[in-house]
Amino acid sequence: MKKMKAIRNYAPQDIRYEEVDIQQPGDNEVLVRIQAALTCGTDVKTFRRGHPVLIKKTPSGFGHEFAGIVEQVGNNVVDFKPGDRVVAANSAPCGKCFYCLKKQYNLCENLDLLNGAYAEFITVPERIVQKNLLKIPTGLSFEKAAFAEPLANVVHGVERTGIQPGDTVGVVGIGPIGLMFARLAKLKGANVIAAGRNPLKLKLAKDFANADEVIDLKKYQH
């Protein structure tokens, strides 16, 4: 069996760079060659203290935000072929449980989860192939495409808030999600106030998100 390099999660604060078998795609699965992988805040938390939902059994793959190129497809896969540029969400709902029937898919009781983006290859399971594996548009880089899942959360949040031109929006906490939210709120025509503590992120709130006002919360600590 062919091998690959991968980062494996063994326990909180115990990750290892190892050589492991490449998992061949089964029926309805897709093998992707990783081109870009991000570090999510959840990855940092998982490294520090574990995650009972995202990683239920160790050792396991690690990392879940990625983009890449289809290397191989399993039997019955018709929507993707080797060479396709793709990005995937790290989960897919079952479509059958109490919450899915109410279209509250984020609360699905039987989520299919995917870890293992910190590797040369990742095998995307059937349900995620069917629901949340997407082709990357021409001209969009792998690095930017890998933001699809966190950006989708931001878009959903902006839609739920019903932001209108001229509204004033406060964003407290300007990590990647907060910065993207502030940027989209500006694109919706809102006046944006961004508040945080990190000097670099405060600068990004101005330069990237184009916030109208940036507040350094450290100035108000007692």
Language-model features: locations:
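Residues that mark the start of a beta-strand
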Residues: 5, 29-31, 168
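Cytochrome P450 core scaffold surrounding the K-helix E-X-X-R motif
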Residues: 42-48
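Short Gly/Pro-enriched turn/cap motifs at secondary-structure boundaries
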Residues: 10, 21-22, 57-63, 110-116, ...
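NAD(P)H dinucleotide-binding glycine-rich loop of Rossmann-like/cofactor-binding domains
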Residues: 94-172
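Residues forming the Rossmann-fold NAD(P)(H) cofactor-binding site
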Residues: 179-182
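Glycine-rich beta-strand-centered segment in the early N-terminal region that forms part
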Residues: 23-37, 51-98, 135-137
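Hydrophobic/small residue at the entry helix of a nucleotide-binding pocket
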Residues: 153, 177, 201
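Adenosine-nucleotide cofactor-binding segment
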Residues: 168-171, 186-222
